[in-house]
From Swiss-Prot:
Its main location: mitochondrion. Belongs to the complex I LYR family. This is LYR motif-containing protein 2. One of its GO terms (cellular component) is mitochondrion. One of its GO terms (biological process) is mitochondrial respiratory chain complex I assembly. The keyword Metal-binding does not apply. Keywords: Mitochondrion, Transit peptide. The lineage of its organism: Eukaryota, Metazoa, Chordata, Craniata, Vertebrata. It is found in: Mitochondrion.
């Protein structure tokens, strides 16, 4: 008798990394909504979506962790720029 899980079920580690990626994506899109110029806002939304789509098929854990770190840095940079623009 085999496992009850479907063959494509994620391991706990994969699930946690996926949640981290989705959380980062949501944070980026929330920050982008704070951009005052509508054209810049659309550009940044498309850029973020394309970056995540382009890397959707990544499976190597080290590469995914590096991409998460890179995304977090870019989010911090965006938040810093937005904070400076408001000042």
């Amino acid at each position: 008798m085999g496992s009850r899980l479907p063959p494509a079920a994620l391991t706990l580690k994969q699930f946690l990394v996926r949640q981290q990626v989705l959380g980062l994506y949501r944070k980026i899109l929330r920050s982008v909504r704070q951009i005052p110029d509508a054209a810049d806002q659309r550009y940044m939304q498309e850029w973020a979506r394309e970056e995540f789509r382009r890397n959707k098929g990544a499976t190597e854990e080290i590469a995914i962790r590096m991409m998460i770190t890179h995304g977090q840095r870019q989010l911090q940079e965006l938040e810093r720029a937005l904070h400076l623009a408001k000042s």
